[in-house]
Amino acid sequence: VYMGSSVGEQRLSTDVTMGLAQLSGSQERYFYYVSMGLSNSAVLLNGTRHHYCVPVAFYGGNYAINQRHSLSLNGLYTHTLFDPSNKNDMTINTSSFEAMRGNPDLAPLKVLGNTLSYNGQLGKARVSVSYDNNIYFDNIVHRFDADESTIFNTRTNDGTFYGNMLSATCSYFLLSDRLRISATAIEEYNMLRGNEYDLSRNIFRLKASATYLIGEWTVRLNYCSPYTTLDIREPYLVHRRPVYELLASWNHHSWTVEAMVHNPFGRYDRRHVTMDYGCYRRDTWNYHEPEGCNVNLKLTYSLGYGKKSERGDTEINRHLNSAIMRNF
């Protein structure tokens, strides 16, 4: 058991100012929106001030080819914010041989993200295909270096991350629409290019479900295949095990009873984390009991209230009311 202390005082304040101009329009078959402007982050760390002025943009649109097929595109260009845990000027020991070292020169991470998707219906089959592309400029990673007795962990801006994900989902109805079978195939290719890391990973996983309706009963089976993903936060590789679920629900008037069995073949959800950082090699097993074998039972009674009225046609919200930047 490690017991230690660090003495120091850090003062960090961040003021964000952003101005946006928006343009939107719509016709019978399409709508679009574009919101662009500038964001300035005024950061004061221990009496030293930095200004980070970054352009921001949010845009998108949808086109209805006909009543059964549509295309949509949504994108953004924005940046992260800071908190005292990643922008400071301190070194804190976390164990007898490990220490977290702050980086006062840490700069914002810029994100360019685009999602292109298609939704359609072919007879009793419903098809959805989407492509997600994300680029992280000035990507923030963990740099590890060591002296004779300590391994130091420092967050730093290094290189660019390229994330690509192609997913396709097909749902089909059988037995007079009482049985629905759905399958989703996901293919990812992620790259991390920089001075500290030069990594790439091809990832494929499959999700499938079968839902059967009989009277007031619903029974559903879910499955997700095992896969290995590249987590860019340090970075590291995470090896995930398959996931199995069985759900049954009963609905009668205002009563609903749901029972679910999650991962019945193992008490724990096991995740294997590996990575070679040069000065040390990470190889750990994480066991999560809440995501392992468990049984959930839920009982719901719905109380009707308010005045009933016929619902009209719903209109797609074509306006961008707000934009939320993320903490890294």
Question: Regions from the language model: what does each represent?
Answer:
Residues 1-328:
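Exposed, low-structure sequence patches enriched in small/polar residues
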